[in-house]
Amino acid sequence: MELLCCEVDPVRRAVPDRNLLEDRVLQNLLTIEERYLPQCSYFKCVQKDIQPYMRRMVATWMLEVCEEQKCEEEVFPLAMNYLDRFLAGVPTPKTHLQLLGAVCMFLASKLKETIPLTAEKLCIYTDNSVKPQELLEWELVVLGKLKWNLAAVTPHDFIEHILRKLPQQKEKLSLIRKHAQTFIALCATDFKFAMYPPSMIATGSVGAAICGLQQDDEVNTLTCDALTELLAKITHTDVDCLKACQEQIEALLLNSLQQFRQEQHNAGSKSVEDPDQATTPTDVRDVDL
């Protein structure tokens, strides 16, 4: 008799606690969220060696690592929060940027994952340009500069608070959530969103997700303007600011899709058997505008 071990243990999750979705929790998140934002636009006043395109490159690499390791959705935005806060206070040579990104993923996965990423695995993703001991030493450096304040508020903390207040059918919420999570990951790769309050990014992402799905009449129960006003009311956000944020998110998605299609076109001669490389955030190709 042949025995096959095909069982895959599902991720064990706690039962949703309604107490964590009460208005007082949302208000507390709104009160403290700006404590964890970068204090300045560090490319102008702190970093002399690192340019915005370098941040975008390391962010894309970090996102691909998180996707391949099937990390929780919160890990990547949280890691980018650590990276931006560190760079806002510490001049860093560009040769250490990938090391910093690996350390930030290491810390974020410890906070959000049941089984966190290991130092050895992260070093493999750097093509062994970083050694495990070096990563562990830098872990202490980053922790010290962040003053051990790791429980940062991210856009994901607001998603469930927002969704439960929307007049949407429950069976549609999972699709809206999935698209909103994609937008949040996309925003984390672009520095212009680094100093936006997480609540605004979350609200804009949900709004962009629903408006992008408006071809489905069952999803679109409100006009986009009415939806924006409702979302702004939920998170106490200025309507005009929210509209501007949502437009920037949609423009970022469009640019990402165009870039992906261009890369596909350039790789037209590539063998069909070659694996598809992650060049765009999770499920971006499935999002409609």
Swiss-Prot record:
Modified residues (Phosphoserine): 271
GO cellular component: chromatin; cyclin D2-CDK4 complex; cytosol; nuclear membrane; nucleolus; nucleoplasm; nucleus
Keyword ATP-binding: no
Pfam families to which the protein is assigned, alphabetical: Cyclin_C (PF02984), Cyclin_N (PF00134)
PROSITE patterns reported for this sequence: CYCLINS
Major location (coarse): nucleus
Region of interest: Disordered: 264-289
UniProt PTM comment: Phosphorylation at Thr-280 by MAP kinases is required for ubiquitination and degradation by the DCX(AMBRA1) complex. Ubiquitinated by the DCX(AMBRA1) complex during the transition from G1 to S cell phase, leading to its degradation: ubiquitination is dependent on Thr-280 phosphorylation. The DCX(AMBRA1) complex represents the major regulator of CCND2 stability during the G1/S transition. Polyubiquitinated by the SCF(FBXL2) complex, leading to proteasomal degradation.
Domain Cyclin N-terminal: 26-151
Keyword entries, A-Z: Cell cycle, Cell division, Cyclin, Cytoplasm, Membrane, Nucleus, Phosphoprotein, Ubl conjugation
PTM sites of type Phosphothreonine: 280
InterPro entries linked to this entry: Cyclin, Cyclin-like_dom, Cyclin-like_sf, Cyclin_C-dom, Cyclin_N, Cyclins_cyclin-box
Organism domain of life: Eukaryota
Subcellular compartments: Nucleus; Cytoplasm; Nucleus membrane
The protein's name: G1/S-specific cyclin-D2
Organism listed in the record: Mus musculus
Classification of source organism: Eukaryota, Metazoa, Chordata, Craniata, Vertebrata
